[in-house]
């Protein structure tokens, strides 16, 4: 019997307070980036803002207000804009993958071509003072905006960015696959086995029901889009 005890569907959940730092274009918000194997959903719980997205189909702006649910698939370059106290509960497909590196910032091409340069520009040391973490988070946001605006102005470069992002994360794929097997795949396989049992008239798995709860493992962590309250991931 497949064992799975995580959140429904293998998703990850976090609570996000979007950065209100102004950028060079006069907008306040987070760091543009994409995910390569995970869809992401926003459940807006407070404030107002928008998410700018860039895909092969073009550029869009989706307004965000309390009650809005917005989501996008892998390959979507996204930038959150804060227009006043924007707070979001984030649902991420394949819980654990983004924490394991399934996120590439839209840095200028020379950083994407050099894994060491990319890591140096994007890593926030966990043991650094809060002021230093904030400085690094803001600096990498501004650097990513340089690459993002270049893609906005010349969207034909998006395919090259996709290729560079895929090359950057390729060494991590085996680790991602292991996390996916423990999480989302295990959740789906458990459902399949439950359906097989029910089709045979076997309700035995219902006696194995459990209840779980957790509190955030970190509060106010500096993320790509803002400060995060996060939960343990597999």
Question: Model segments located where?
Answer:
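Conserved short histidine dyad/triad with adjacent acidic residue
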Residues: 15-35
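His/acidic/aromatic-lined binding-pocket segments of jelly-roll/cupin-type domains
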Residues: 32-34, 39-44, 61-62, 70, ...
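Short, conserved beta-strand element in jelly-roll/cupin
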Residues: 36-51, 91-93
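Short acidic-glycine-tyrosine-enriched beta hairpin
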Residues: 54-75
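Acidic/histidine-enriched, beta-strand-rich ligand/metal-binding domains
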Residues: 64-66, 77, 81-89, 94-104, ...
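An accessory alpha-helical subdomain
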Residues: 125-203
């Amino acid at each position: 019997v497949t064992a799975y005890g995580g959140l429904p569907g293998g998703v990850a959940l976090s609570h996000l307070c979007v950065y209100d730092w102004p950028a060079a274009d006069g907008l306040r918000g987070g760091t543009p980036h994409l995910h390569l194997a995970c869809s992401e959903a926003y459940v807006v719980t407070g404030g107002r803002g928008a998410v700018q997205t860039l895909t092969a189909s073009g550029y869009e702006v989706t307004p965000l207000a309390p009650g809005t649910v917005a989501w996008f698939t892998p390959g979507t370059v996204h930038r959150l804009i804060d227009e006043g106290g924007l707070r979001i509960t984030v649902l991420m497909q394949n819980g654990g993958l983004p924490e394991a590196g399934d996120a590439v910032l839209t840095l200028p091409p020379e950083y994407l071509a050099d894994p060491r340069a990319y890591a140096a520009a994007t890593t926030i040391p966990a043991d650094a003072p809060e002021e230093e973490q904030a400085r690094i988070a803001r600096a990498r946001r501004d650097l990513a905006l340089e690459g993002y605006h270049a893609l906005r102005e010349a969207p034909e470069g998006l395919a090259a960015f996709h290729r560079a992002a895929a090359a950057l994360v390729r060494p991590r794929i085996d680790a991602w696959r292991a996390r996916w097997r423990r999480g989302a795949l295990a959740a789906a396989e458990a459902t399949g086995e439950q359906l097989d049992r029910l089709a045979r008239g076997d309700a035995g798995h219902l006696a194995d029901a459990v209840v779980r709860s957790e509190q955030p493992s970190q509060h106010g962590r500096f993320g790509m889009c803002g400060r995060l309250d996060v939960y343990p991931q597999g």
